Amino acid sequence: MNAGRVFTEKYLRLMFKSLRDATPEEVMEELEHCRRENRRPVRIPRYFRGFFVEDEKFRASTGFEMQVFRHEVPELVEGPKHNLILYLHGGAFIYPPVFFHGRFLHDIALRTHCDALMPVYPKSPEYDCEYSVKTLLEYYQSLSESKRYDEIHLVGDSAGACLCLVVAQEAHKNGWQKPATTTLLSPCVDLNHTKEKEMQALQDKDSMLQYDRIVILNAIWQGKLAAMHPWVSPVFGDLGCIDNLCVYYGSDEILQPDDLFLKAMYEKAGKSGIFQEYEGMFHTFAMFPIPEGFRATKKIAAFIKERRLH
């Protein structure tokens, strides 16, 4: 086991310890903290100020003004600018984007020579799934109707990967521009918790997530929608409409059974995608600066480039 991976996993265990070990009451306190924090605008970390700029806020019919960050590829990188990576960040539906999201998106954008946008969508507990999805769908519709990009490539991690599947399904349903590729990192796709026993069996191996806490957070995010509603659990939606699907996940995360379930359901819909399970890896490992993360990032970039038409 390499030193970088050991350090990263220990760092993650420490960073998420308060939520992993929290009582239900402490989880609710954390949610209220997130509610206050999410009312504040997200700031670009100093390290990324040469690459990311804040785009114009998108005002949805819901009334929400959504921050959007644009990645500007330096002039020294040659390549077409008419392809877009739309990145939906994770964070248990409650947290804003962090440094590792920016680092990963920066790397992917440089490797693929694509423009990149990262919207800061509405979060729980202030907003629920229905409100947030409506906001994101309006934003995607605006991108589609602008005809600015020849291709849109969806990329997301964890909760954001869930939303990527929702957007891809709704784009097909509504006749909007179809995503050229959809890439998911450790997606959370089944809030019905169909694989509950299998998820709990992996609990001791997971350095970030705690099953009981996820159930609480997911129930609040779910709002009034049914657990098997395709906006809540897109694994039960129209998977047959999604082409060029690529999924990366680790064997040591409690969402691994979810991702195997997604693979089975995708194949049941008559589709064939790329599902890469990395042995001994943790949740969203591909985002982190470790050898396995670098290798996964290179493969993801190659996947996008190989399936580009322009």
Question: Which residues does each PLM region occupy?
Answer:
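Alpha/beta-hydrolase superfamily serine-hydrolase fold, recognizing
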Residues: 62-67, 75-310
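A glycine/proline-hinged amphipathic helix-loop "lid/cap" segment
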Residues: 1-76, 309
